[in-house]
């Protein structure tokens, strides 16, 4: 698992292909987030060794598809399919739990726009939206990000039918799970549960 993480990190730092100084399609992203009023991300909100923070600071190359003051979307340098892209917040949050709801909302609000453009550009039929949150879920870069993975019929990437699934048993165990989740939700401050109007 560690070797895989290292390989993916290296692939994001050193994308395969032409030298970025000679290829005009490779762009280094700037750090415009507007968070400090001068258009720059404050250095305290970025991590020195995070590959995505390096991209945001302009220290590593990327193929940028979209950018605004909250997030950017880049092509994944180790794609599962043609057009596999990542939506990344411009500030460093290691996991989804640590990412403020407003940042998650800003990232998710871009999904229809970006995914539609990617699906059209790649001639895909559909796409998967994926978040690997935590090591056990396969997260290898600990900077929150959302994968947009374009799909075509019979692409053999994976199918939900290929996963071993079991019917939910409406039993005591399921009821206990529902009660436990509800207790955790009830323990949250009300402002976290109420959506702004």
Swiss-Prot record:
General function of this protein: Possesses adenylylsulfatase activity in vitro.
A GO BP annotation: sulfur compound metabolic process
GO molecular function: adenylylsulfatase activity; nucleotide binding
GO annotations of cellular component type: peroxisome
EC number, UniProt record: 3.6.2.1
Originating gene: HINT3
EC class of the enzyme, as a word: hydrolase
Presence of keyword Nucleotide-binding: yes
Sequence intervals crossing the membrane: none
Key word Magnesium present: no
Entry-linked PROSITE patterns: HIT_1, HIT_2
Location in or out of the cell: Peroxisome
Name recorded for this polypeptide: Adenylylsulfatase HINT3
Locus of motif Histidine triad motif: 143-147
UniProtKB keywords: Hydrolase, Nucleotide-binding, Peroxisome
Residues at the active site: 145
Region (Disordered): 14-43
Catalytic reactions on record: adenosine 5'-phosphosulfate + H2O = sulfate + AMP + 2 H(+)
A Pfam short name: HIT
Gene3D superfamilies named among the record's database cross-references: HIT-like
Domain HIT intervals: 51-158
Residues the entry annotates as binding substrate: 147
UniProt-listed CDD domains: HINT_subgroup (cd01277)
């Amino acid at each position: 698992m560690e070797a895989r993480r290292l390989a993916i990190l290296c692939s994001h730092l050193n994308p395969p292909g032409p030298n970025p100084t000679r290829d005009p399609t490779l762009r280094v992203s700037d750090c415009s987030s507007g968070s400090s009023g001068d258009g720059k991300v404050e250095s305290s909100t970025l991590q020195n060794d995070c590959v995505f923070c390096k991209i945001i600071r302009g220290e590593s190359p990327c193929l940028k598809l979209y950018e605004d003051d909250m997030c950017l979307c880049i092509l994944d340098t180790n794609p599962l399919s043609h057009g596999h892209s990542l939506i990344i917040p411009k500030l460093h949050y290691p996991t989804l739990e640590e990412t403020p709801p407003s940042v998650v909302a800003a990232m998710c609000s871009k999904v229809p726009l970006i995914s539609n453009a990617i699906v059209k550009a790649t001639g895909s039929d559909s796409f998967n939206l994926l978040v690997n949150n935590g090591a056990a879920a396969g997260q290898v870069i600990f900077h929150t990000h959302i994968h947009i993975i374009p799909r075509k019929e019979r692409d053999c990437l994976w199918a939900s039918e290929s996963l071993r699934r079991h019917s939910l048993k409406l039993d005591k165990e399921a009821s206990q799970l529902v009660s436990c989740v509800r207790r955790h939700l009830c323990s949250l401050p009300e402002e976290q549960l109420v959506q702004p109007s």
